Each structure stands twice: as C-alpha cells, then as structure tokens.
C-alpha cells in the first residue's frame, strides 16, 4: 500500500485502485462529515455488493445495453444498402466489435483502477483526456436515455391510437417515470435480473414482427416471391442516405461504452472473454436474421422500426411485447452515468456504496435528475433524433473503434507473443482506427445533411409539441 501512495504522490494523474475485499483498508472511507470511518461495516458490505457479477450476468447486462428496439431498424438499413452489403456489414461489424471489446477487456485487466470509460482517458492522455472522454461518456448516455423517452412515447401512441387526442407530452412523462423507477437498483447484478425479461421481450417482439410480415406478404398478390427486395443498394442512393443506413448497423453494436463500468463489478474480471464472445455472436445472429428476413418479407417499403410494417393490430401487440426492452434497456444507461458521477464526486465516501440513508438519497436524486434532463432535452430539441445521430457519430465512433485501437497501441501492444502476431494486430487496429475516423467524419456529415433535408421538407417538429409521434 505504501508504494501505491508513493505512486499517487509522484503522479497526480494516477488512478489508484479500489481496495479489494480482503484489503485491510477496505473500511477506511469518509463519512458525511469528512472524517475517516475506520473499517465501517457499510463499506465492507458495499464493496461486496458491487463485486457480485459473474460472466453470465455480465453477458445479460451487455445484452440489455446492446440489444434494444433499434435492432428493428436494421431491415430499413438492409432496404437501403441491399441484402448482400447488409449481411456483410452486419457480420463484419459484429466481428470487429467483438475484437475491440476484447481490447477493452485486456486494458481493464492491465489497469484494474479503470472503473468507467472516462478513466481510460486519464491512463492514455492524462487529465485532459479524462475530462474530454468524461464529457463524451455522460452526454451520450443521457442522450440515449432521451431516445428511450421518445421511443416510449411512440409506443404508447401506437398502442392507444394516440390516446384519442392525448398530448404526446403525457406519454413522454409516463415514459420518463418508468425509466426512473427501473433505474433505482444501483448494482448491475440487480439489473441483470431485469435483463432476462428484457431479452425475452426483444426476441418475442422480433419473432412476432417476422411472422406477421411474412404472413402479410404471403397473402398479397404473387406471395413472397413477388416482394421486390434486392441484393444490391437501391438506385439514386445518396452518400448521406447510405451512410445513415451504415450507421444504424454500426451503432447496433455499440455496447463497448459501458463495458468498463460492467467489468468493474465482476468478481472474476478475466472471465470477460466468455461474455463478449457470447454477446457478439448473439448480436450477429439476431441483427443479420432480423434485417435479412424482414426485408425479404416486406421489401423496400419496410418501416422503421420494422414492427410498424406488421399491420395496425400486430404492431400494437409487438409494441406491447417490446415494452420491457424499451424501458429496461434505457434505464441501464441512467444507472451507468449515475454510478460514474457519484464515484467521481465521492470516491472515498460511503455514499458511493448506496447502502445508507444518505447514499440512497443521493442515488435517487441523481437518477431523478438525469432522467429529467434526458426528458427535457428529448422534448425541447425539435430534431433530437438527428442530434442523437450526430452525437453517436462523434462519440460511439470513438468508444467502439478508435479509442480501443489507441488502447492497443498505447497499452496492450507489447502483450503479443510473436512478431508476426504483433504485425497482424497492428494492421487490424489500424483498420479499427480508420473505421472509427470514417464514421466520425462521414457519419457526422450524413446526420447534419439529414437535419437540413428535414428542415427543407418541413418535417421538424416544434419543442414540447403535443402532436403525435406515432
């Protein structure tokens, strides 16, 4: 322990690891008054509480983070890009994201003190890197919560036929309340219990969508054989339109942003490999089958999300089945950002364990505040969905691609056991870096162009509008 404190003294930017459960200093945390509370039982209990995650539950929470209703936007991406490019991109991006998640896992094992993605910025670039990535991390997570508020609003509107004139703001408020309530459990081991419901929900919604669209198409003139799907991109495809479709596929694999946060709660972090491989293969299967099958059943007129193509009645059924995934997948982002902020503000305070009255008050306050901010942003910005696309291009390109490449070159490169393997990994990580830069540049351009097109066609709504979104 003396060497750790000497390291901190010599390097102010060093991130010191949290003490392990058998560390004699585990209880030496500060209370509300700032004094040391020697070997406090709450600290020992709290430390154990936040180290209960095994690889199976890690897989579940990664699924909650990664697989949401956005998977039903992939048939629309396939309709734009064509069946062959769609399948190649879906499988290829999935394999690349499995690898970049592996790099993130290796980085966590080499630097156990990294508790959230922002911390790796300090390891690689010092304080300025920490602050920049922290800003990206918090903003993107809050925007994702906001997107689930809007998705919930659309869902309620579809199920209730827009509530016979009910203001859509009411549906937004109801969605925000549900997101807040589901974010109350502070540990990911607890969230994983909801994750099983989440996974069954999205699988059932996808299955209903595929069956319903298949039946509708088979009953039309000419049957399934008459559906005009294509192997190749549609004619007159613009760069912006094409890259938005590519972005929908890329962003479907954007689970890396929360991987450090989840791994920090594992009791055996080295088991992460099982989780990322399992998740990656599940995602590749679901996304490729969903995108390809629904596009083949509906054709170029497929709606986004695709369950809207299932017909009025079955769209309501599918949305109802998907209700858990809309809110559980959204609430986990609130948990991640709340955990990060509390651990940043009170790194040595028993509050961060959320097992005292003061800890629970702070936790509920952060959950409520983040959900409120997400709702306000989602309702106040008329082009919020497009702004989310810009932020995703700016930030997820880093979290999933070029930051892991930089981690490899700055942290894990020397772990390669042979020169040939090192050269291969050098090339692979250069490819990841180039992909990230391409998404950053072209993706941002495509999202901005889409906003301009929507303004030109009068498709941008007003702030806090009561108009139905469904």
Curated annotation (Swiss-Prot):
Recorded topology in the membrane: Multi-pass membrane protein
Membrane topology (Extracellular): 1-56, 99-131, 258-275, 338-357, 408-427
Stored InterPro entries: AA_transpt_TM
Keyword line: Amino-acid transport, Membrane, Transmembrane, Transmembrane helix, Transport
Cellular component GO terms, alphabetical: membrane
Residue numbers on the Cytoplasmic membrane side: 153-168, 212-236, 297-316, 379-386, 449-470
Region (Disordered): 1-21
Location in or out of the cell: Membrane
Molecular function in Gene Ontology: L-amino acid transmembrane transporter activity
GO biological process per UniProt: amino acid transmembrane transport
Listed Basic and acidic residues bias regions: 1-11
Transmembrane segments: 57-77, 78-98, 132-152, 169-189, 191-211, 237-257, 276-296, 317-337, 358-378, 387-407, 428-448
Protein family per UniProt: Belongs to the amino acid/polyamine transporter 2 family.
Reported function: Required for the transport of neutral aliphatic and aromatic amino acids via the N system.
Protein name: N amino acid transport system protein
Organism, as annotated: Neurospora crassa (strain ATCC 24698 / 74-OR23-1A / CBS 708.71 / DSM 1257 / FGSC 987)
Gene from which the chain derives: mtr
């Amino acid at each position: 322990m003396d060497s750790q404190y000497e390291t901190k003294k010599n390097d102010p930017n060093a991130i010191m690891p949290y003490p392990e459960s058998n560390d004699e200093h585990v209880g030496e945390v500060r209370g509300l008054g700032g004094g040391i509370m020697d070997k406090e039982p709450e600290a020992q209990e709290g430390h154990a509480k936040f180290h209960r995650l095994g690889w199976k539950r890690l897989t579940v929470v990664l699924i909650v983070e990664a697989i949401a209703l956005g998977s039903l936007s992939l048939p629309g991406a396939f309709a734009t890009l064509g069946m062959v490019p769609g399948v190649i991109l879906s499988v290829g991006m999935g394999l690349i994201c499995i690898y970049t998640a592996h790099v993130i896992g290796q980085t966590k094992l080499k630097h156990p003190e990294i508790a959230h993605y922002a911390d790796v910025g300090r390891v690689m670039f010092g304080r300025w890197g920490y602050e920049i990535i922290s800003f990206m991390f918090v903003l993107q997570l809050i925007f994702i919560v906001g997107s689930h508020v809007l998705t919930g609003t659309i869902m309620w509107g579809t199920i209730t036929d827009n509530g016979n004139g009910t203001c859509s703001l009411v549906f937004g408020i109801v969605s925000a309340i549900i997101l807040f309530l589901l974010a109350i459990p502070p540990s990911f081991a607890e969230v994983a219990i909801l994750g099983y419901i989440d996974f069954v929900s999205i699988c059932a919604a996808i299955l209903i969508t595929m069956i319903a669209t298949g039946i509708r198409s088979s009953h039309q003139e000419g049957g399934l054989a008459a559906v005009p799907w294509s192997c190749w991109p549609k004619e007159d495809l613009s760069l912006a339109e094409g890259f938005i479709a590519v972005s929908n596929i890329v962003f479907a694999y954007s689970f890396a942003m929360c991987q450090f946060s989840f791994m920090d709660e594992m009791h055996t972090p080295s088991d992460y490999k099982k989780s990322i491989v399992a998740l990656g293969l599940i995602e590749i299967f679901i996304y490729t089958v969903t995108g390809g099958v629904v596009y083949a059943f509906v054709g170029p007129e497929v709606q986004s999300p695709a369950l809207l193509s299932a017909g009025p009645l079955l769209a309501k059924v599918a949305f109802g089945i998907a209700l858990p995934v809309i809110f559980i997948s959204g609430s986990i982002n609130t948990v991640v950002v709340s955990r990060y902020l509390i651990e940043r503000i009170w790194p040595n305070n028993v509050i961060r364990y959320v097992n005292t009255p003061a800890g629970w008050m702070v936790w509920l306050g952060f959950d409520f505040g983040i959900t409120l901010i997400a709702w306000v942003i989602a309702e106040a910005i008329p082009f919020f969905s497009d702004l989310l696309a810009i932020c995703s291009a700016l930030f997820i390109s880093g979290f999933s691609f070029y930051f892991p490449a930089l981690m490899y070159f700055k942290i894990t490169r020397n772990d390669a056991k042979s020169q040939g393997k090192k050269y291969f990994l050098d090339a692979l990580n250069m490819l990841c870096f180039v992909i990230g830069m391409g998404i950053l540049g072209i993706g941002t351009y495509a999202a901005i162009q889409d906003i301009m097109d929507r303004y030109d066609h009068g498709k941008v709504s007003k702030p806090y509008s009561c108009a139905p979104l469904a």
